[in-house]
Amino acid sequence: MWGSRAQQSGPDRGRTCLLAVLLLSFSLFQLHAQDYKPSQTPPPTSDALLKPMGRVQKEICGKTKFQGKIYGGSIAKAERWPWQASLIFRGRHICGAVLIDKNWVASAAHCFKRSLKPSDYRILLGYNELSNPSNYSRQMTLSKVIVHEDYNKLHSQEKDIVLIQLHLPVRYSSHIFPVCVPDQTTKEPSDESCWISGWGMVTDDKFLQAPFPLLDSEVFLMNDQECEAFFQTPQISITEYDAIKDDMICAGDITNQKSTCRGDSGGPLVCLLDSYWYLVGLASWSGACLEPIHSPSIFTRVSHFSDWIEKKKADTPDVDPSLAPLEETAPSLIGWRNYSAGTTLEPRICTTLLSSQVLLLQSIWLRIL
């Protein structure tokens, strides 16, 4: 993440710079300052039947210690995002992930390009700073890795989702708690802000520094047509180009330079719906993670996969606890190394033209005000 933002990468596509600039200038995101208020009690941990939106939930989900709206961004407060997970590959953070119930975690399929062997990975839960585990922090071993069978088959980054079954169920606390999973009837907010979080890079050439704090950012959802303008080529009209598929959703805040970056892949895009936090997206790809930010980030639209998620969970046998490895000590990450190319996909960006046009138009706009 850069400052108060998280940023990710994107596929090898061009874009129409002038149109992107015009959209940036005349479609500035409305900002919402939000207050948070710590509650007196941690989120409930007992099982219950809820119906926050659409499908009945088997467990309580989407509640945090922070009730009401949230202000600002940058370094996230402990317990703010208790579903945030880190995907570790051979001892190194490579991607974000999200706890969706006591046995399952979701992430981006492209995070598993290195290996599909569960024993190569670990899931970290209950962390705020990756180098400073707390008494709530847990390192979980993986039983199964289920990549969507149609990932990348027809289009780049399409169906970029993976389900991860844990060997042992997690114990819920105010630091470890699942987010709600939307179904296809869940309506995404059109006029409210959402949030992204992760331990990714600050920029493409700047690593997050120790103690590796979790960063978060307020972002806004963008309709597909507006988003398409940032990723089309000059030779193809907006009606012919189709970078944003039905299983993708756009979000960002270009005005305030908030996006996703390397190492944020698979992390959450969450929105507050009827007082519950929902996993609207999983970080998938975006433009280059450099200043100034030229384009929104693209996320896997989780509601598109709600039936797939339920089916895979139902079809997968529970792990026999007697056969599971012993729970491991939560580690303290002490080094930060380059991410493999698998965690980021960067499109070609007409940086010079776009940067100069943005600065010019923003200057004119400020003078008019």
Curated annotation (Swiss-Prot):
Disulfide bonds join 95-111, 194-271, 227-250, 261-289. It comes from the Eukaryota. GO terms for biological process: proteolysis. InterPro entries: Peptidase_S1_PA, Peptidase_S1_PA_chymotrypsin, Peptidase_S1A, Trypsin_dom, TRYPSIN_SER. Its EC number is 3.4.21.-. Residues 70-314 form the Peptidase S1 domain. Keywords: Cytoplasmic vesicle, Disulfide bond, Hydrolase, Protease, Secreted, Serine protease, Signal. Its main location: cytoplasm. SUPFAM superfamilies: Trypsin-like serine proteases. The active site is at residues 110, 160, 265. PROSITE patterns: TRYPSIN_DOM, TRYPSIN_SER. Pfam families: Trypsin. It is found in: Cytoplasmic vesicle, Secretory vesicle, Acrosome; Secreted. Residues 1-33 form the signal peptide. One of its GO terms (molecular function) is serine-type endopeptidase activity. One of its GO terms (cellular component) is extracellular space. Belongs to the peptidase S1 family. May play an important role in the sperm/egg interaction; released during the acrosome reaction. There appears to be no human ortholog of this protein. This is Serine protease 40. It comes from Rattus norvegicus (Rat). The gene is Prss40.
